[in-house]
Swiss-Prot record:
Keywords: Apoptosis. May be involved in apoptosis regulation. Residues 105-125 are annotated as: Disordered. This is Uncharacterized protein C3orf38 homolog. It comes from the Eukaryota. GO terms for biological process: apoptotic process. The keyword Disulfide bond does not apply.
């Protein structure tokens, strides 16, 4: 798992953009031991960031030339003597990224009565807006969008309809992946890059197709007073013309305060059960099991991964 913070990852992404394509591909081969075969430049950069254990490990690579780090710092307004050695340039880059969060803290105003009034008015406005949200419609539209986008990344279905990536997730998103096929396992993934890549690999490398059950039994919705919306959906898992089993997926969504009518994924619980683990001789239609009362526990610990109910078709 990557050791880069979100700020370091974004900084390194901009720095790597200064390398040419051959250098990017060569660096990707070195870092991943040629175990990852990127389709293009952006795939290679994602792999470099994901598999780098630290900023030092990445920037000390011979393929990341001293001149590149110097040029990046110059574009960010960090003026350093041209003769500065590479290890000092790396430290300057690390220091620069650490400072990116500090201005936000300093800009926070001191609590005064007028500010309290503005905050109170803003909170009241947000609460009124929250009351206007149709969570059922939001959940239905989200599920349709999410699964169409994810499934479109399956190379067996032709070119993707839109770009998949970490931009659809909060940077500290969590994914809990439980699968019961030939073996049982639960694996946790953290961070937008890691989570987006793991979900992408299901359809792009394992050629799976997730078909959600969008009727009343296959979906449930709930919302917390803090603005978190929980969307649950069940469905079947396919590869080509073969049905491999069923899945249950629960999303936690939070509205993006900077972009109107935009929600991002805060956490996901994904449970896949292989056909061999289902009762033989029955066609099963999965149904979501969580109730609105489960929301508080799910919101606090994000560990709900209970058994799936089945309804005979």
């Amino acid at each position: 798992m990557t050791g880069l913070s979100y700020t370091e990852m974004e900084g390194c992404r901009n720095l790597l953009s200064l390398l040419d394509n051959d250098e990017i591909m060569a660096l990707c081969d070195t870092i991943t031991n040629r175990l990852v075969q990127p389709e293009d430049r952006q795939d290679a950069i994602r792999a470099i960031l994901v598999y780098s254990q630290s900023v030092e490990e990445l920037l000390r690579r011979r393929k990341v030339h001293r001149e590149i780090i110097f040029k990046y710092l110059a574009t960010q307004g960090v003026i350093i003597p041209p003769a500065t050695e590479k290890h000092n340039l790396i430290q300057h880059a690390k220091d620069y990224w650490k400072k990116q969060l500090q201005p936000k803290l300093k800009e926070t105003p001191e609590p005064v009565k007028t500010e309290d009034i503005r905050l109170s008015e803003q909170q009241e406005k947000e609460e009124k807006n929250a009351e206007k949200v149709d969570f059922r419609r939001l959940g239905e539209e989200f599920c349709q969008w999410f699964f169409e986008l994810l499934n479109s990344q399956n190379p067996l279905l032709g070119p993707p309809q839109d770009e998949w990536g970490p931009q659809h997730f909060w940077h500290d998103v969590k994914l809990r992946f439980y699968y019961n096929t030939s073996e049982q396992n639960v694996i946790d993934y953290h961070g937008a890059e890691i989570v987006s890549l793991r979900l992408l690999s299901l359809v792009k490398e394992e050629y799976l197709f997730l078909s959600p059950n969008l009727d009343s039994h296959g979906q449930k919705y709930a919302a917390s007073p803090h603005g978190l919306v929980m969307v649950g959906v069940a469905g079947t898992v396919h590869r080509g013309n073969t049905c491999l089993g069923i899945f249950e997926q629960i999303f936690g969504l939070i509205r993006c305060p900077f972009v109107e009518n935009t929600w991002k994924i805060k956490f996901i619980n994904l449970r896949i059960i292989g056909e061999s683990s289902l009762a033989p001789g029955r066609l099963m239609k999965p149904a979501i099991t969580f109730e609105p009362s489960d929301l508080e526990a799910f919101y606090n610990v994000n560990t709900l991964c209970g058994p799936v109910k089945y309804n005979s078709m």
